[in-house]
Amino acid sequence: MFVHRLWTLAFPFLVEISKASQLENIKSLLDIEDNVLPNLNISQNNSNAVQILGGVDALSFYEYTGQQNFTKEIGPETSSHGLVYYSNNTYIQLEDASDDTRIDKITPFGVDSFILSGSGTINNISVGNQILYNLSTLSMTPIFNQSLGAVQAVLADNSSIYFGGNFSYNNGSMTGYSALIWDSISNTTQLLPFGGFGENSSVNSIVKLNNDNILFAGQFYTLDDPSALISSSNNGTNSTSSLNATTLELGQRIPLRYASWDSQGSTTFASDSLVCPNTNEDAWLYPDTSGSLVCNLPYEVSPTKIRLYNSQRSDSEISVFQILTDPSSSIMNLTYLDPLSGELKNCGEFCPLYSRATLLSASQNVSSSMDMITFIDNNKTDVKWTSDFQDFAFVNELPVSSLKFVALNSYGGSVGLSGLELYQDTFSTYANDSLNEYGCSALTNDSSSSTLSSNDWYNGLTGESYIAAKYVPDQNEPIPRVKFYPNIIHPGHYTINMYTPGCLQDNTCSARGIVNVTMWNQQNNTIMKTYLIYQNNDNLKYDQIYSGYLDFSPEIVLEYVSGIYTTNTATVVVADQVNVITVSLDAFNTLSDSSNAKKETLLNGILQYQKSNFTSTRLNETKVGNTTLNLFPVKNYPKNSSLYADIYDNKLVIGGVSNRISIVDLNDDFEVTSSKNQTIQGDVHGITKTNQGLLIFGDILSSNNQSAVFLFNGSFENVFNQSRTVNSALNISLANNDFIVLDNDYVVNASSNALIRNSSSFSLSLWAAGNNGDGDVLFSGAVSHMQYGNLNGSVRFLNENEIEPLNLEGGIVPYLGAYLNESATAYAYEVDSLNKIYFSNEVYPSWNWSSGITQMLYADNQTLLAVSAGSSTTAELSIFDLRNLTMIANETLGSNARINALVNFEKNCSMLVGGDFQMTEPNCTGLCLYNYESKTWSTFLNNTIFGEITQLSFTNSSELIISGLFETKEYQSIRLGSFNLTNSTMIPLLSGSEGKLNSFTVTEDSIVAWNDTSLFIYRNQEWNITSLPGNASSISSVSAIYTDIESNTLNKRGINNVNNGSILLLNGNFNISQYGYLQSLLFDFQKWTPYFISETTNTSNYNPIIFINRDVSTEFNSQSPLANVNITVTSPQSTSSQPPSSSASSESKSKSKKKKIGRGFVVLIGLALALGTVSVLGIAGVILAYVFKDPEGDYKPIKPRIDENEMLDTVPPEKLMKFV
């Protein structure tokens, strides 16, 4: 598994950066400081003496302020939508964001900036406006003045930034769809030269091919400026069109069978002939050179053009006319293709209508039928002429209820028409099938139709086209149903809308219901789309039910589902019309029947945009050509495909639908030279570029029918298998590892393809990420990263900032240790609710305890191991002979007892037991003597030392230091005392009613005691109290680390107490606002330094502790025999005839003494601790300290310069209270 520095994996392409381009700058801007650790002289040479036991699973040494924000495992409460910066193993939180903010894409730009795309806000700036985030200044600037919506692709091309997605942007003169350019130098926004990719399009990928060519991939088939797709060819050969221009109709003829006409004054009028033109006879004649004809439509329409057939008689042919409409009551502006000049012209009050002879002559002189037709309004309307008629397109598409045709002049003496037709650019199919009828037998096969269920349908309001039926369920009535059959004549792309009349006008809002609309493919009887539509809309509305390619006529079924309001028994179901809008037709692909035909470049989700084509000044320059790259998806993918693309090693990878991924080889001119397909099962939803290659993901199934994610780096490799579709894949490099994050749910190691699960050592939430290649990584999400993970419960230090797992045999997780000798250590551990001991020389004794082991003491001369165990209700003492692993003694103390400390008197075969207990036989309170040879208990000094004992330690064989909260006959509330075993005298070192001390340690020149929240330090002849920094901090243990680099001081106390220094290593839980939650601090008696943060294993019942694996036998074993354990403790006799009168006099005496005595002698019992040889000198040190102390042993704490925001730098000498 992954252990050292999170993982031992290292990839050759991931080189650790010594200094990121923006890291130091960001640190400076945010006042982030590096945490420099002192030299602790910890190395493997001192037998790995410093260890952490107790279930540690992950650990990070504190290296910089703010690191704590990235060490807690990610959970549901973690904020993961802000911005995080990473470089050189440093994480920095740059911005926070609420959960409704979503950054979907981060794109590097320049050497110091990134572009953020998404939704929501950061610092009140809309992410949808696209944000330029500058690392040099940590500033954010919105790029656009409006939200773009869904941005799916961003490409930085020098100073131009291309945005692609599903959005629209209006530059004041034109609306562009799905693409936009921002110029970073001029800070201006512009559409592409061709606008965009048309309505209902989307851009999924933008790929830079070279400085002149950019590839767009997505779902589109046209451009906002379709003229860019038109090119002229003159190859000297004729080709035959599959569809002649004269037969192509983009719009639908509006049925006029039920229109009413006003032909007052006419000599001839036949409406049936007028709307169904017969080129051999006139349908309307008026006996003057001017006249009018009015058509009142059965319902309101928005016509796009009118087609006029001039009179068959030369004397009645109209030469000039105009069109007026209601309700606008205005003359309509018209556009027509002039048969004589071939130009597109406009007219209004006076529009020319050519004679049949003129049209016939013009038609005989054209070189191609394409000269008789043109397309306007983005190819939605065709305007043409033939020898029989002329088309006039309405410049303004307005609603029309009545149309008046006015003949203003004639080529002869009267005016007349043989035909009049209206067209609209939509195909309407009405529920009232009579409105679908043209009334012309020749057009029967071209008309749309509908059928109704056998309910009582009735017409809606007068002048409206809808019908309605009242329906009461469970009354043996058929379910109201309407089937629409829109007639699709030409294959192409269409949009279909279902119209629903409003309920306010007919006052049926409270009775309206819910209908289901289903679109069927009649060729294979499959459902294409289905929707629920609520019909209680106040006004006329439409719902889009389809947009895409059709080469057949579908069936659309509207059917009652339920009422909306439970109070109504009857539901009014309404049905109006299905509206089909032509987007583009395949017929455009083949419209050519001459050598000079204009050809349209076909698109299907891929566009090769060559910038120079749009800047060239040459006439007839092709803007978008039929390049092999543009034509590749046209020939190889279904129409209207949604495609994704990217480049790897000069190979273009294309994915989308149709169960394949295409690998396209390109030459230097980006021409397709070859291609091959990788067969897959499913559709591609995206392609992401990673350090290893291209990641291809989507609804792709592997051979075992699980979702697959492929990596392409010249060949295909499956990197993920799960039972779900993958909609997002991101790549990020952190901590010398490369990760792939799928749907912000799965994290995959990119080298091994191993799935990484969130843990205490590493967890990641990732919405978007960007890397500028200079070592700056910016991502939206959250991360928890501990330097060392999977530590298996215990570690040893290799140096002051490097560790490795202890890895004891059998996966043992120890929580307590005891040094035996240079080759063996005893460890306490728990397994199956039993507590046991393991020896590191792989010896497993059979002993076990039901309660946790609290103390272990080893006597080397006797090879004896004393073990105390206990719970909240009982305590147990066990003593073993390690020569044969036999138990010497086993004792259980009474209820509510706890053993805290043990020291051994070898000569007496007795163990002095300290703790929190009460014994009656013998009478012991907190301190009792146990003879493990006779297996008997006895009082220690007639129980004249009593209370709660927390720690016992010899300074030499006859000096015993005791901590806790205890009393003697002379002193009360002793918290720390020194007891002389030779003369049975007690010297209180610290007294007071503030509570017990938990323990103490002794350095070369200091005594350090502590309770939960403070250190009590005797140094330089004075005591002071140093409170822990921060709030709610607590100490578990304090260890002295000796920093003398000349001696192996971890194995034994230093001898030269002048040159040797020491640093206190605190273990516990420390909450400091500047550093967060820590588990270890360092204190050099002047300032605090954060040391490490750790996490425990889920299975451990113990808190991690620091274990110094060194020989401490002299601290807990005495070679001096106890002369008389039943004498009474006394106080020492003062060497001064008078007690000190004041602090001032005490200070004066101290200074005079200091001139005569070396520093090591002045420290309380320091000589005995440093030399450990002559007990008399130890006694002298204690007495010396006692002479200059207050009778009550009180102390006054200083107020250290420590708060939550700073560490203690130094303690002013004038503020220190003398130990006098």
From Swiss-Prot:
Pfam families: Rax2, Rax2_2, Rax2_3
GO annotations of cellular component type: cellular bud neck; cellular bud scar; cellular bud tip; endoplasmic reticulum; mitochondrion; plasma membrane of growing cell tip
Cellular compartments annotated: Cell membrane; Bud neck; Bud tip
Coiled coil: none
One BP term from GO: axial cellular bud site selection
Free-text function comment from the UniProt entry: Required for the maintenance of the bipolar budding pattern. Involved in selecting bud sites at both the distal and proximal poles of daughter cells as well as near previously used division sites on mother cells. The RAX1-RAX2 complex performs the asymmetric localization of the two cortical landmarks, BUD8 and BUD9, at the distal and proximal poles, respectively.
Other facts: Present with 3670 molecules/cell in log phase SD medium.
The protein's name in its UniProt record: Bud site selection protein RAX2
Organism: Saccharomyces cerevisiae (strain ATCC 204508 / S288c) (Baker's yeast)
